[in-house]
């Protein structure tokens, strides 16, 4: 079941936070930057994972560490070079990544997930196009899914 909330996703009480990234993402803007600052080990492990496994857009990778679990949904094209910015997101990649998220939730036995407005910041997609796709994959889940449709830094959302 999805509950739309407003607030700071980093303050979520959900077992995992899901957000959109690109393979080999630099985590230098938006929510990714905040996650990099909050969980520096996650970013280091993410870079290692990308170098070892070369994930493709549409995949998902979960990181578990002290303080939380972060689900990285590969919704964007990778950067063309080591120093360039990631490519744009696509609704096809969002579809595939959400399918992988549902599998991860089941495999990991997660009891709640917070998810950001996927692919609409750096990814460049329109929220009105992405939101129904999120609902199509996650609305039927039997666990709470907190959709952070509006971000307000420092504000704890009313998840319950």
Language-model features: locations:
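Macrodomain-like recognition of ADP-ribose-binding/processing modules
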Residues: 1-160
